[in-house]
A protein has these predicted regions:
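Membrane-embedded helix-loop-helix hairpins and adjacent transmembrane boundary segments
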Residues: 1-506
Length: 506
């Protein structure tokens, strides 16, 4: 349980972050301010916000839980997945999106294909964010119950009220600037657990000796790459095809919560630099969220639920004061992701669905109100759906499973739309819907198709292949778009322009 000094630190953090968020609400005077900060953010703030958004409370609990069960292989999601994808995004995709003046990625898909593709892509991300929010709230309950003795529903509602208040009023500016503080707290708190945990384990040498001495079941715990026939969710084939080629690129290039920050920067240079800044910080994330799971294997073997590894370390190893600091860092990780999801989903709903299909020519003030109402509705939905997360084998598996349903198809449509002029509006729609249906079928028959229990990496890969194949096949038998309609929508090399004006290059 937390001590008096711990409670003082946590309360000071909550009050401070609330005041900071509401302070930046003063600068929100229009829908553009709420959704894109008036394109005024510096690269360093956006880079830190990207990391704070990507690394949530789910990672502290869920990634530690996966490393407790399977070892270092889960670290490949950052080192082999996210970092290469962020470099690709920084130098090719983000500058292109920034120059196009986009609010959302589905907005580009609507311009390139049609409104149906835009609506389907936007709704899939909205559904994912709603489910993701439930997972994050459940991570709160997992952490709060052993440390504070709070019932799950009480923990979830308190968290929802605090983060919802400043996101509702402050928009993206409040989200990003509070994320800067929260990322610093996240790193400090995570480092405290790592240092104290390694000390109790006897250093790195003591940690490796203890785990390798525990028997054959733990021999792969220090391997980043696992064989193709492993029973874990991380075979090298899945890491290469499902993670490195599809999921990581789809997440860093097509995720509204990530890309929206880059689109809110001052210039193309700041947009590029923000993603590179984020990639630099991402190098250290596995150290903070994965290694505690390994430490828990050595210090507390035999936990029935791997997701209890991180809370168990905090409860049993950290002294008063440090425990409160870590708990504040955990809350920072949680709130930085929740506020990002709320703002990004409000943007998707307002710009891609409401403004496009419900009320096209309303006032700027009206769209600001719609975005704020969407924030409240999503918050309530996340609270209600949070218990669904307990049905999965770990919080991390829940998130990756939700992502694998649609990331491959959406990324295939985006990729072909940007780099293949022959892709047609019907090709995009058939590829997107067909790819998502493929994901659903793969999960229905997963016990007959895959040898691992949680095949989200394979589902991502094969749904990407299906979506791309259906897009190509349908495009080849349907009428292509005229060249002038593609101006500014297809990424071309300078030598391919042949006099076509106003076409962005890559």
């Amino acid at each position: 349980m937390l001590s008096g000094i711990d409670y003082l630190i946590v309360i000071a953090y909550l009050v401070g972050i609330m005041v900071l968020g509401l302070y930046f609400a003063r600068f929100v005077r229009s829908a553009d301010d709420f959704f894109l900060c008036g394109k005024s953010l510096p690269f360093w703030a956006v880079g830190m916000s990207i990391v704070a958004t990507d690394i949530s409370a789910m990672d502290f609990v869920g990634v530690a839980g996966q490393s407790y069960r399977f070892g270092m292989a889960v670290g490949s999601f950052d080192w082999l997945g996210s970092m290469p994808a962020m470099l690709l995004a920084a130098f090719i995709f983000i500058p292109y999106f920034w120059k196009a003046g986009l609010y959302t990625i589905p907005e580009y898909l609507g311009r390139r294909y049609n409104d149906y593709v835009r609506a389907v892509a936007s709704l899939t991300w909205i559904i994912f964010f709603a489910l993701d929010l439930g997972v994050l709230f459940w991570a709160t309950a997992v952490m709060f119950e052993p440390l504070m003795g709070w019932k799950p529903w009480f923990s979830i509602i308190v968290t929802a009220l605090v983060v919802g208040l400043y996101t509702f009023y402050g928009g993206l500016t409040a989200v990003v600037m509070t994320d800067v503080v929260q990322m610093i707290l996240m790193f400090v708190g995570g480092a405290a657990v790592l240092v104290v945990g390694l000390y109790h384990a006897g250093g790195w040498g003591g940690l490796t000796d203890k785990i390798t001495a525990m028997g054959e079941a733990y021999q792969n715990h220090f391997k980043l790459i696992l064989p193709a026939d492993t029973k874990t969710p991380f075979p090298w084939t899945g890491i290469l095809f499902g993670l490195t080629l599809v999921m990581s690129n789809a997440y860093m290039i097509g995720n509204q919560a990530i890309v929206q920050r880059c689109l809110a920067t001052k210039s193309v240079w700041h947009a590029k630099a923000s993603m590179l800044c984020g990639a630099f910080f991402k190098m250290f994330i596995p150290v903070l969220v994965m290694f505690p799971g390994l430490i828990a294997v050595a210090q507390f073997p035999g936990l029935e639920d791997g997701d209890q590894a991180f809370p168990t370390l905090v409860k049993n190893l950290l002294p008063p004061g440090l425990r409160g600091l870590l708990f504040a860092g955990f809350l920072a990780a949680l709130m930085s992701t929740i506020d990002s999801i709320l703002n990004s989903t409000a943007t998707l709903w307002t710009k891609d669905v409401y403004q496009r299909f419900v009320k096209k020519n309303a006032s700027d003030r009206h769209y600001l109100m719609v975005g704020q109402v969407a924030t409240v509705v999503l918050l309530i939905f996340g609270v209600i759906t949070s218990p669904l997360s307990d049905r999965f084998r770990g919080l991390y598996v829940a998130i990756q499973t939700f992502l694998s349903f649609f990331q491959g198809p959406v990324f295939s449509v985006l990729l072909l739309g940007m780099f293949w002029p022959r892709a047609t509006q019907w090709g995009g729609l058939v590829g997107l819907v067909g790819g998502i249906c493929t994901s659903a079928l793969l999960y229905v028959f997963k016990d007959h198709l895959f040898t691992i229990q949680d095949p989200f990496l394979y589902v991502s890969w094969w749904s990407f292949v299906a979506g791309a194949s259906l897009n190509v096949a349908t495009s080849l038998v349907t009428r292509r778009h005229p060249e002038e309609r593609l101006a500014g929508l297809v990424c071309r090399l300078p030598r391919d322009l042949r006099g076509v004006s106003e076409v962005p290059t890559c």
